[in-house]
Swiss-Prot record:
Entry's Gene Ontology molecular function annotations: RNA binding; structural constituent of ribosome
Keywords, in A-Z order: Ribonucleoprotein, Ribosomal protein
Higher taxonomy: Bacteria, Pseudomonadati, Pseudomonadota, Alphaproteobacteria, Hyphomicrobiales
UniProt-recorded name of the protein: Small ribosomal subunit protein uS9
Source organism of this protein record: Rhizobium johnstonii (strain DSM 114642 / LMG 32736 / 3841) (Rhizobium leguminosarum bv. viciae)
Family: Belongs to the universal ribosomal protein uS9 family.
Amino acid sequence: MADLSSLKDLGTVSEAAAPAHVRKVDSLGRSYATGKRKNAVARVWVKPGSGKITVNGKEFAEYFARPVLQMILRQPIVAAARDGQFDIVATVAGGGLSGQAGAVRHGVSKALTYFEPGLRAVLKKGGFLTRDSRVVERKKYGKAKARRSFQFSKR
């Protein structure tokens, strides 16, 4: 451990210990990240471009027909003020459409921070980098559902 003779020394030690977020880009200039939500897992690649978003080989508006799901997917891009600056390619599997949209959103957020580490603070504040850990509660025996009991008859 470093020798701490004053509070000023403490600041230099803590700065050195904090991990610096480094730009992670492959040989093709893309950043890769995985996003998860419920049972859906998305693999996302982000690269500079015109703003085209492709999900499982289809245009994102075609894959996610509901406007709410399209809005969920675009949230991190709009929050980072990078609308129309990145091409996004995602493959997503598992779960339903809502979980898949959340998984792609999580993956896009992580990939944006890998590509441009300066966006991390904005996306973290918006809650886009946090994995939403809520999943369906399992059904218990002796119950109709996870918590709902069978109908009770007094007589």
